[in-house]
Curated annotation (Swiss-Prot):
GO CC terms: plasma membrane
Chemical reaction(s) catalysed: a 1,2-diacyl-sn-glycero-3-phospho-L-serine + H(+) = a 1,2-diacyl-sn-glycero-3-phosphoethanolamine + CO2
Taxonomic lineage of the native organism: Bacteria, Pseudomonadati, Pseudomonadota, Betaproteobacteria, Burkholderiales
Keyword Lyase: yes
Membrane topology label: Peripheral membrane protein
Protein name (record): Phosphatidylserine decarboxylase proenzyme
Active site as annotated: 181
GO molecular function, one term: phosphatidylserine decarboxylase activity
Site positions (Cleavage (non-hydrolytic)): 180-181
Compartments (UniProt record): Cell membrane
């Protein structure tokens, strides 16, 4: 189940191969004068699909960020996927962020719920309930943690590689959202948020909250 953490995400390999197939002959025939726009596109795609290895934040009972991005929501609300009141923390991913999604906790995958939907701006609150999304409900040492991949205005492809019954490790790569979007995290009300709206976070490196009894 563990992903080998390549420098370039596997989701980007087909794009790089296609651009390379076009760029190399153009460069060979016309030189850099003709091929430089294609090389710029190649470099942009290379940067876009980067997938660096991450070292988990140190400490006990930590809920790690599942994505790179910016905190847009920290609030108590209803978790519609686990039917409970919960602490919700949302990470907005723009097109320049790393797009891999990683587990926030160690735990057992109890449910995976997919919902087709719209593609409104993922920075808006209504994106959580109206957009295409994929919810993963995890039992983390008796605590329910819900991770929701949400598609956005540009991101229209949610990828999830895990199944019900899989065991995840905190920081383990479990999905990908092409071209950025949003990940909502729902935690028990006993969780203490460690981030605020506007904070910049990094998947696995940043702790979103502390949940007593998690470890």
């Amino acid at each position: 189940m563990m992903y080998p953490h390549p420098i370039i995400a596997k989701e980007g390999w087909p794009y790089l191969a296609l651009i390379g197939i076009v760029t190399l002959p153009v460069h060979y025939i016309g030189g850099i004068a003709w091929s430089w726009p294609l090389w710029i596109i190649f470099i942009f795609v290379l940067q876009f699909f980067r997938d660096p290895q991450r070292i988990p934040a140190m400490g006990r009972d930590l809920v790690l960020s599942p994505a790179d991005g910016r905190i847009v929501v920290v609030e108590k609300t209803n978790d519609p996927y686990a039917d409970r009141e919960a602490l919700k923390i949302s990470v907005f991913m723009n097109v320049f962020n790393v797009h891999s999604n990683r587990s926030a906790v160690n735990g057992l995958v109890k449910e995976i719920q997919y919902f087709p939907g719209k593609f409104v701006n993922a920075d808006l609150d209504k994106a959580s309930t109206e957009n295409e999304r994929n919810a993963v409900v995890i039992d983390a040492n008796g605590h329910i943690v819900t991770l929701v991949q949400v598609a956005g205005l540009i991101a229209r492809r949610i990828l999830c590689y895990i199944h019900v019954g899989d065991r995840l490790k905190a920081g383990e790569r479990y999905g990908f959202i092409r071209f950025g979007s949003r990940v909502d995290v729902y935690l028990p009300l006993t969780a203490e948020p460690l981030v605020s709206v506007g904070d910049k976070v990094f998947a696995t490196n940043t702790a979103l909250a502390r949940l007593p009894g998690l470890d």
